[in-house]
């Protein structure tokens, strides 16, 4: 089983996160940031992983530290669970519609960190959630997983729908990339390592 558990404690947050890439049971997610709980639940469902997150953070300031530190911890868990990345597809991509919005994700578990985030999130807040934190979250995930991650909203009007399409697309693309392919011997790279 490809699993990982991490605890990250700073002066601003305390994060406990575990992931199982090969088993999907109901995830338990409690971050103190309601909108992020919703998005992480969607991500877990569409990536077909079990994700457990317990976070306490300085949300009385705002959600920035909590969102970023969860992204860091998720990225570190993904990196550990994937280990040497033997026999995985490595690449994944997905288009996901959410009503009037269309989101796209392409990723490469290459060992090289990069984020391209192309999404016009016209509403700066959804409830108490600052929508600029979506990019911060994905930046933290990409750099700590060491993945090349491209996210784009092709069109849409509703900011909630745009973000939801991105999280679902990320989940579906990740599932494709982490799937073990019996036709791939070793790692999917001419270098011999990822």
Curated annotation (Swiss-Prot):
Coiled coil: none
Pathway involvement of the protein, from the record: Amino-acid biosynthesis; L-histidine biosynthesis; L-histidine from 5-phospho-alpha-D-ribose 1-diphosphate: step 6/9
One MF term in the entry's GO annotations: imidazoleglycerol-phosphate dehydratase activity
Transmembrane segments: none
Entry GO terms, CC: cytoplasm
Pfam families xrefs: IGPD
Primary location: cytoplasm
InterPro entries: IGPD_sf, ImidazoleglycerolP_deHydtase, ImidazoleglycerP_deHydtase_CS, Ribosomal_Su5_D2-typ_SF
The keyword Lyase is annotated on this UniProt entry: yes
Keyword Nucleotide-binding: no
Location in or out of the cell: Cytoplasm
Reaction catalysis annotation: D-erythro-1-(imidazol-4-yl)glycerol 3-phosphate = 3-(imidazol-4-yl)-2-oxopropyl phosphate + H2O
Domain of life: Bacteria
Main EC class the enzyme belongs to: lyase
One example of a Gene Ontology biological process annotation: L-histidine biosynthetic process
Record EC number: 4.2.1.19
Keyword field: Amino-acid biosynthesis, Cytoplasm, Histidine biosynthesis, Lyase
CDD domains: IGPD
PANTHER family: IMIDAZOLEGLYCEROL-PHOSPHATE DEHYDRATASE, IMIDAZOLEGLYCEROL-PHOSPHATE DEHYDRATASE HIS7
Protein family: Belongs to the imidazoleglycerol-phosphate dehydratase family.
Protein name, entry field: Imidazoleglycerol-phosphate dehydratase
Origin species: Listeria monocytogenes serovar 1/2a (strain ATCC BAA-679 / EGD-e)
Gene: hisB
